[in-house]
Amino acid sequence: MPAPRRRPLVFVILAALVGGLALISLGVWLGARHPSALPGPLERALAGPPADRVVEEALDDVGSTYYRKIPRSQLRDDAIAGVVAKLQDRFSNYFTPAEYKRFKDQQESSFTGVGITVSSDPRGLRVQKVFDGSPAKRAGIVAGDLFVAVNGKTLAGVSGDVATTRIKGPSGTDVTLTVAHDGKRKDVTMTRSEVSVPVVASTLREACGKKIGVVGLSQFSSGAHAEVYAALKRLQKRGAQAFVFDLRGNGGGLVDEAQLIASAFLPDGKIVTTRGRNVPERTLDATGDPIVPKGDKIAVLVDRNTASASEIVAGALQDRGRATLVGTRTFGKGVFQEVIELSNGGALDITAGQYFTPNGRNLGGRGVKTGTGLKPDVPAKDDPKTRADEALRVALRTAGGCAVKS
């Protein structure tokens, strides 16, 4: 019987190594060991490159191959912005470091800009109001003008928050806005300056034989509740028997301010409930120290640009039977965002959940993309061809308790 053939030692060692690798592979996948616990070369062989490494690899390739040189920081900014854009959520944004600084400035009652309030438009930003003495006023900008580009960059499809941050900037610097008006376009260059936003405006009017206090709020910025409280108390001292709370053109702001301002009209109970996938449900109640007595009638004046925190207040007062909504249907922003600061100085502003009125209505109605808003109890609309404020006239008669003429 012939003796068995002996395999070369090299072949045996090689077979052992291959077998060892196979066992390690089985250990990784069948034994639930994570590839990251293995040596680097073996990890790459078994699991491939980590996802973040693929992203960096793609940025490297774009930066080294594209025919024009693009700064690495811009590539990263654009990559993050692209991820957020894929959410197809008009309220979620990525702010570059410069944009984030300007975004935070929007929460204050003063900022450096051109002195306007705007609303979102699919083509850009629609001018709602121009402040007296502002760069925009001096440049001839009027309500109704449409900004379609900033410094040559289109605003079409850009979220309102990002678009407004592009207009703002350091005092003394120039910004060129492309304005569409009466079917024509022209570039208007303005020098940014410090702009103080009148957060609250108040006046005493008469209707139906009663003195009516009118309080207008432009934004729910930090400390806005204190100005609203002060205005209400001043009007009460002057004999106000009912109130019109004007939220037209108010695009919202801080939810905590909305709670405090609604508390000026509500003695107790629920104001708003927030719910999200990864955030605990939260209910905000009235603080229990109202300024306006229960017997005083209130009309809340709203329009299509009344949004977010404004809708929280208007919706709470409507649901609780405390006020009559006058005007047009509101914007319908039934979601809230969470701001997440990033290590590069920028930030993500991501939709984290929805909010609901005391009766459980979601203000967005049909969800993130299109909102139904709040339906007014008394429809009223201004005629842009007249200088009169027809909607305010209806609100005054509503608060005064007399019949509203159709």
Regions found by a protein language model. Give the residues of each.
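C-terminal "post-core" interaction segments
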Residues: A16-I24, A201-S406
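PDZ domains, with a preference for the canonical peptide-binding region formed by the helix
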Residues: L146-T178, E257, K333-G334, V339
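Terminal targeting/pro-maturation regions of precursor/exported proteins
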Residues: P2-F91
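Conserved PDZ fold ligand-binding element
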Residues: G63, A136-S159, F243-D246
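PDZ/PDZ-like domain micro-motif
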Residues: P50, D132-D145, P198-T203
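PDZ-domain C-terminal substructure recognizer with occasional recognition of PDZ-binding tails
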Residues: L125-R126, V148, V162-A201, T351-A352, ...
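Terminal peptide-recognition signature
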Residues: A58, A79, I116, A136, ...
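PDZ/PDZ-like peptide-tail recognition elements
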Residues: D78, R90-R126, T191
